[in-house]
């Protein structure tokens, strides 16, 4: 830091000529002693507010700070380089949710196969359940991509064999299948809430944000949509109304 120093008063008095402008005093710059700040520098570094505390002016020294953080970069080739603040409980909970989504996809695929039979031939229901199966599989893949993104390891688990027959003596196959779908969506929603709870308990804001933004809102919409389908199918009964409902599903956009 350089300070402006004026020479002695005697040296500063120039020879004044009649009518000539005064010569400005020379300015000499000298280095301030180490550890001593000029008043203007101190004022520039004062904290906002009451202005009583003088700050150092240094906010972040990256190369100094990362020296103590190099342990965060693993040297072993079998360790993830991207993993940071991602605990084992969250990794395990994500793998469980992947399994939930794949099981839901498998169950919907079985419903699709049933309604696509030649002796059932409700193509609208088959289309709806096929799209639902694809959606659940996409959810599983999205969770797998996120697991890899955070440096976790995807561990696929067994899938339970689903039902293959969905006829019901009182409700009929259409209503019974849609009630099963509603129960399945509520179960998936419950599992997502459990995953969110694990992320919250482990203080993982990135995972909680991912679940909220990518899954929970969509899950609520799916529950509401299928709830309305169940209500409508209860009104139409097992007769001719099921065919009309099937046509509605066939024409509906995904």
Swiss-Prot record:
Gene Ontology biological-process annotations: intracellular iron ion homeostasis; iron ion transport
Broad class of the protein's primary localization: plastid
Cellular component GO terms held in the UniProt record: chloroplast; cytoplasm
Induction remarks: By iron.
EC number: 1.16.3.1
Binding site for Fe cation 1: 101, 136, 139
Signal peptide (from-to): none
Region (Extension peptide (EP)) location: 47-83
CDD domains, per database record: Euk_Ferritin
Entry keywords, A to Z: Chloroplast, Iron, Iron storage, Metal-binding, Oxidoreductase, Plastid, Transit peptide
Tissues expressed in: Ferritins accumulate in seed during maturation. Then, they are degraded during the first days of germination. Present in roots and leaves after iron treatment.
Entry protein name: Ferritin-1, chloroplastic
Organism field: Zea mays
């Amino acid at each position: 830091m350089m300070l402006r120093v004026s020479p002695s008063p005697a040296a500063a008095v120039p020879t004044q000529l009649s009518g000539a402008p005064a010569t400005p005093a020379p300015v000499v710059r000298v280095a301030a002693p180490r550890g001593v700040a000029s008043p203007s520098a101190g004022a520039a570094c004062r904290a906002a507010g009451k202005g009583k505390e003088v700050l150092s002016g240094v906010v972040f020294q990256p190369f100094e700070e990362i020296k103590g953080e190099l342990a965060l970069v693993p040297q072993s080739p079998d360790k993830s380089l991207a993993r940071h603040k991602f605990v084992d409980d969250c990794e395990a909970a994500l793998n469980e949710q992947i399994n939930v989504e794949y099981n839901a996809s498998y169950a919907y695929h079985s419903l699709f196969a049933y309604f696509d039979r030649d002796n059932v031939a409700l193509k609208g229901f088959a289309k709806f359940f096929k799209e639902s199966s694809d959606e659940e599989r996409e959810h599983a893949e999205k969770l797998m991509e996120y697991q890899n993104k955070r440096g976790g390891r995807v561990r696929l688990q067994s899938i339970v064999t689903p039902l293959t027959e969905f006829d019901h003596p009182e409700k009929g196959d259409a209503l019974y299948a849609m009630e099963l779908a509603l129960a399945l969506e509520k179960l998936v929603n419950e599992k997502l809430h459990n995953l969110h709870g694990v992320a919250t308990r482990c203080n993982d804001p990135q995972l909680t944000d991912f679940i909220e933004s990518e899954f929970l809102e969509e899950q609520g919409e799916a529950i509401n949509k299928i709830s309305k389908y169940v209500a409508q199918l209860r009104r139409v009964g097992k007769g001719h109304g099921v065919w009309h409902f099937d046509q509605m599903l066939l024409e509906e956009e995904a």
